[in-house]
């Protein structure tokens, strides 16, 4: 079984062979898709006159600050347009996909963060209200497995539900890692717009789990989250994490074959 995270930046730019590639893999093993879409959320926020706000953690991770209004827009865009567009593409190509958010059947439960520690404009650490951002606590693995058993391909948007039944924004890469770990996927694949982790403009072909943890603080914000998610997935029992480019031919099967991508394994 493989869990695939499709980054929002590549949803509209996937290689034409990608859907057929997903279909081929889905026929031989279960496929779970988790998607992003942050850029589309930002675009809709601006169209609605809501200025997007981003914050940076002391470790350098940049993330969206999600107040109540942003959480509503995030839910609308992620679980509406983006999720259903992906499901439509899959259905059009003979893949029996079902679109879900983490709210449906409590697929992803999270705890609302009370405080966020950020670095402010003056470069100082500051604690601010956590807004509607969540830390993933649980995944409804049995429900996801039941969909796979019926021959369905789940397509999950990273909106979680809190104990108080609030919509919470959770990071898509980490959502994919938790889904992969809890469901028991042997592989998690992060599809992005570069060939993997780049160091000195060259793809790093292989990392052990220990090496990935050691190297993570030295990596730029976008890829840093993917390395973090990869290590979390492996810590939860996933065998292999892959980071690959979705804009080349047959990106899924190429990554599974370890062709021109970054592979992270326990040893």
From Swiss-Prot:
Pathway: Amino-acid biosynthesis; L-lysine biosynthesis via AAA pathway; L-lysine from L-alpha-aminoadipate (Thermus route): step 2/5; Amino-acid biosynthesis; L-arginine biosynthesis. Its main location: cytoplasm. One of its GO terms (biological process) is lysine biosynthetic process via aminoadipic acid. Its EC number is 2.7.2.17, 2.7.2.19. Substrate binds at residues 37-38, 64, 169. GO terms for cellular component: cytoplasm. It is found in: Cytoplasm. Keywords: Amino-acid biosynthesis, Arginine biosynthesis, ATP-binding, Cytoplasm, Kinase, Lysine biosynthesis, Nucleotide-binding, Transferase. It catalyses: [amino-group carrier protein]-C-terminal-N-(1,4-dicarboxybutan-1-yl)-L-glutamine + ATP = [amino-group carrier protein]-C-terminal-N-(1-carboxy-5-phosphooxy-5-oxopentan-1-yl)-L-glutamine + ADP; [amino-group carrier protein]-C-terminal-gamma-(L-glutamyl)-L-glutamate + ATP = [amino-group carrier protein]-C-terminal-gamma-(5-phospho-L-glutamyl)-L-glutamate + ADP. The record marks 5, 226 as: Transition state stabilizer. The keyword Flavoprotein does not apply. GO terms for molecular function: acetylglutamate kinase activity; ATP binding; N2-acetyl-L-aminoadipate kinase activity. InterPro entries: AceGlu_kinase-like_sf, AcgluKinase_fam, Asp/Glu/Uridylate_kinase, LysZ. The keyword Translocase does not apply. Pfam families: AA_kinase (PF00696). SUPFAM superfamilies: Carbamate kinase-like. Belongs to the acetylglutamate kinase family. LysZ subfamily. PANTHER family: N-ACETYLGLUTAMATE SYNTHASE, N-ACETYLGLUTAMATE SYNTHASE, MITOCHONDRIAL. Involved in both the arginine and lysine biosynthetic pathways. Phosphorylates the LysW-bound precursors glutamate (for arginine biosynthesis), respectively alpha-aminoadipate (for lysine biosynthesis). This is Putative [LysW]-aminoadipate/[LysW]-glutamate kinase. The gene is lysZ.
């Amino acid at each position: 079984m493989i869990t695939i995270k499709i980054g929002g930046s590549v949803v509209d730019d996937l290689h034409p062979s990608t859907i057929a590639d997903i279909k081929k893999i889905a026929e031989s093993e279960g496929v779970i898709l988790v998607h992003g879409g942050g850029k589309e959320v930002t675009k809709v926020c601006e169209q609605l006159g809501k200025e997007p706000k981003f914050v940076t953690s002391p470790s350098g991770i940049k993330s969206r600050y999600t107040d109540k209004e942003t959480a509503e827009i995030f839910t609308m865009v992620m679980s509406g347009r983006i999720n259903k567009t992906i499901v439509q593409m899959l259905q059009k190509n003979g893949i029996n996909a079902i679109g879900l958010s983490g709210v449906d059947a409590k697929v992803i439960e999270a705890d609302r963060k009370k405080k966020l520690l950020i670095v402010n404009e003056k470069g100082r650490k500051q604690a601010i209200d956590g807004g509607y951002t969540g830390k993933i606590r649980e995944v409804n693995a049995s429900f996801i497995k039941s969909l796979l058993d019926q021959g369905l391909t789940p397509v999950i948007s990273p909106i979680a539900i809190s104990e108080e039944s609030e919509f919470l924004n959770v990071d898509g890469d980490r959502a994919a890692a938790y889904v992969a770990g809890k469901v028991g996927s042997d592989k998690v694949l992060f599809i992005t717009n570069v060939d993997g982790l780049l160091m000195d403009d060259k793809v790093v072909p292989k990392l052990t789990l220990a090496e990935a943890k050691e190297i993570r603080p030295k990596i730029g914000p976008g890829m840093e989250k993917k390395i973090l998610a990869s290590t979390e997935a492996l810590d939860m029992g996933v065998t292999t994490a892959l980071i690959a480019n979705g804009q080349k031919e047959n990106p899924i099967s190429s990554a599974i074959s370890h062709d021109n991508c970054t592979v992270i394994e326990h040893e």
